[in-house]
Amino acid sequence: MHFTRTLFNQVASKASRQLPVQKRVQMAYDLHIPNKTVNPNLNIRSHEPIVFVHGIFGSKKNYRFDCQKIANVTHTPVYTVDLRNHGQSIHALPFDYETLAQDVADFCEDHGLKKVNLIGYSLGAKICMLTMLQNPDLIRSGVIIDNSPIEQPHIEIFLQMFVKSMIHVLNSTKIEANDSDWKRKADDAMKRYIPDGGIRKYLLANLINKVPKGYKSPVIDYDDGFIHFQNPVKHMTEVAVKNVSAWPTEKVAGKTFEGPIRFIKGTKSAFIDDAGKKAIAGYFPNHSISEINATHFILNERPLEYVRVICDFIKTERFRSLQEHLRNVEHFSPSEIEAKQAAKHAQQIEELRKVTSTSESSIPHSTQSSEQAFTENIDLARQEREHQKSVSA
């Protein structure tokens, strides 16, 4: 009896705790390195990395296969992150767009990432848009999947249902961690609130019956013998609804991001409506929109299509950037411009060549792909052009 009361008191004490406030967190992440390119003679890996940010109650593991495909096709390292209160990242407040966007910017800074291509879905889409607006020099381009930079109070009822269904699984069923049928029982319990099997699968992907090695939560007792979500859902009933549907309009008033942005809209989704399109045009003048026949859950319903749109966009923008670099190099003539401009250009070229002179073996595995210099692409293109001229001659 004493043991039972002690255990109960420990569980109750932890459940009553509040999420700690932590301004800065180190997000858990996976790095997807591109395999050999389709052409064995072109072992090029861009130094403009991709960072993929998931949606509410998602995680870096949800789209690991998709992100590996993106890495392979674009020859680009892809970082997938776990936002705070998701996956293997820390459980902490605040949980608002300003804090989450700063988490992404801090992640890029901590890992030495520059000219980043951001990809964000749903909650992650808004986070990426805000990151671009607040850190334009850090971001090269972006792909925004089915969301708009506006307040969306109409989605709160769905967010409330998500939270309620997850808490119901924990409170009403009390499924033991060693129950061999725990996944089916959890799915059955969630049907009361979420009849759609695809959405249940998405939410239940966060459910675990044993804690990841070395992970601890300040508010969840993973060792109490029951199944748990990796998200502190009982402590997110407010922030996962009101804060997710919000948008910091006043904070970004007058701000724009001039880089290329591709929006992916689900034709059966209301997340990018007329008001959203108007806001998009105001914040992101250099944007385009692709439509995919899907609901808001595009990534689960049309994985091949959204991956194709992303890869085509990244490769197209890289080609345009390469052409611009080539024009700058070809038109460079020290005798025609001031000496100061010539010295500055030479310094930039030398810095790029220093990066490429570093051997792969001396670069840490987690960063070697993201530090490859863009001059490799320039040299390759020039060689190809010279070859074509010699053939035509």
UniProtKB/Swiss-Prot annotation:
Chief place of localization: mitochondrion
Keyword terms of this UniProt record: Hydrolase, Mitochondrion, Transferase, Transit peptide
A Pfam family it matches: Abhydrolase_1
Domain AB hydrolase-1: 49-151
InterPro entries assigned: AB_hydrolase_1 (IPR000073), AB_hydrolase_fold (IPR029058)
Cellular compartments per GO CC: mitochondrion
Region: Disordered, residue numbers: 343-393
Cysteines paired by S-S bonds: none
Catalysed conversion reaction: ethanol + acetyl-CoA = ethyl acetate + CoA; acetyl-CoA + H2O = acetate + CoA + H(+); ethyl acetate + H2O = ethanol + acetate + H(+)
Record-annotated active site: 122 (charge relay system), 146 (charge relay system), 296 (charge relay system)
Example of a GO MF term: carboxylic ester hydrolase activity
Residue spans of biased composition, Basic and acidic residues class: 343-354, 379-393
Family: Belongs to the AB hydrolase superfamily.
Role summary: Alcohol acetyltransferase that catalyzes the synthesis of ethyl acetate from ethanol and acetyl-CoA. Can also function as a thioesterase by hydrolyzing acetyl-CoA in the absence of ethanol, as well as esterase hydrolyzing ethyl acetate.
UniProt protein name: Ethanol acetyltransferase 1
